[in-house]
Amino acid sequence: MKEYIAEAEKDLLHTYNRYQIVLDKGEGVHLYDTDGKKYLDFVAGIAVFALGYQNKAYNDALKAQIDKVIHTSNYYYNVPAIEAARKIKKVSGMDRVFFTNSGAEAVEGAIKAARKYAYLKDGCTDHEIIAMNHSFHGRTMGALSVTGNPKYREAFQPMIGHIKFAELNDFQSVLDQVTDKTCAIIMETVQGEGGLRPANEEFLKQVRDLCDERDILLILDEIQCGMGRTGYMYAWQRFGVKPDIMTSAKALGCGVPVGAFMMKEKVAQHSLTAGDHGTTYGGNPLACAAVEKVLDLFEEDHIIEHVREVAPYLEQRLNELADKYDCIKERRGVGLMQGLVFDHPVGDIINRALEKGLILINAGADIIRFVPPLVITRENVDEMIAILDTCIE
């Protein structure tokens, strides 16, 4: 394993603070390194592997598509993209879909759609977007510009212009930023990197009403919190606060790089048209075959029902841990997107857990994030808690 790490350090750009293991294969909710060591995975590729590793039906669908065609071009139609779009419309309630290669690309498309929508209304080119402090939407320039964390933005100024920031769950702070030039409000329905902070029902409904009154587009980023993780296919469905534009990725492809931004018909009819936006690989047959099969398996395997059964148990066990240790300030989160907030940095705890065969990740310096495969069991939760308990002691 050490020789692989040495080679990577020599050849790869140093943009990640990687843990000192080399992962080689997965099975169910477990990963194995190149030395054969087994790990219980409560990260799932950062909320990606909803179905776990080596799901046979999923793998078979990808193999079958590889044997047909992997990529064509968006100058032509392909059946997997048509079927995937139909199925994602059904579960999301949105009207139009654009497939991308990643979540960041989906956010870029959402921003462009909102600005074009506003431009067609009044011809102005100085429209404003309101985003949330502590948010994270991606590292491309547009997505970074609406990311409300200065540490990600500082070295890459100037950002795209006319972006303002408000506080999640503080409606007055949003009102304070609204002007006649506001074209969109963007937020994660549950903030991930920002500390597992859910937008509450009252706030979401107030923002939705404001957007309706002022013809402002509401963009909800469901890249991490979507695809069943909160016990609903998309987190906004908990409260019925439907966005005008929505982004999705991560578990949408369960390992195959794919994202999407979706919109209501009123936005689609008055925003992006031919030549406004495009992608070489987005919507390719292989990625869309993955999306299609993921959505089928969510229904066939009753994934959301399972999340609703196991998530309360995870919350209970995390609450017990929080009650046991004074250094844990609180538990936050929804469904299988949880966090424990500590009064000190959590890096050492995560490293000790890794040594004991448990994969965890942080969300900021003082929060351990839990975003496991959606197929985990109560027994997996118990095993995780037992290991984590020994790492905190």
Write out the residue ranges for each language-model feature:
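Conserved N-terminal phosphate-binding loop of PLP-dependent enzymes in the Aspartate aminotransferase
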Residues: M1-E393
